[in-house]
């Protein structure tokens, strides 16, 4: 009987642990970096194209919300192409945005440690 309870629990546990309100449902993203300013959450993510074998990350995206339920996509906010000195077309990893002295700075790590 104990084994039956364990089996039932092992099948039900994934249902309870799954996300009930995924923020981004139409694109592949990674490395979410939230920033709260006034009454808005700004969510910066790296963007993985779905047409590649492995990964193809060339740009960064922005999403915002004032209630953490409804999100607005603002599209690409920066791309590897924006940095002429970057000789790569893949590797747009984990962004981070910070506010300092009433200015916002988007930190974008570059491939192979050149940034």
Residue ranges and their predicted role:
Residues 1-20:
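Bacterial Sec-dependent N-terminal signal peptides
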Residues 17-115:
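Carbohydrate-active catalytic/glycan-binding domains of CAZyme proteins
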């Amino acid at each position: 009987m104990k084994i039956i309870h364990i089996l039932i629990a092992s099948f039900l546990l994934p249902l309870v642990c799954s996300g009930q309100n995924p923020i981004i449902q139409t694109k592949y993203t990674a490395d979410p970096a939230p920033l709260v300013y006034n009454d808005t959450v700004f969510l910066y993510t790296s963007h993985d194209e779905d047409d590649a074998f492995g990964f193809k990350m060339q740009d960064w995206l922005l999403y915002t919300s004032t209630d953490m339920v409804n999100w607005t996509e603002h599209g690409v906010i920066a791309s590897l192409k924006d940095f002429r000195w970057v000789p790569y077309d893949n590797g747009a990893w984990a962004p981070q945005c910070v506010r300092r002295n009433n200015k916002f700075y988007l930190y974008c790590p570059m491939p192979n440690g050149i940034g």
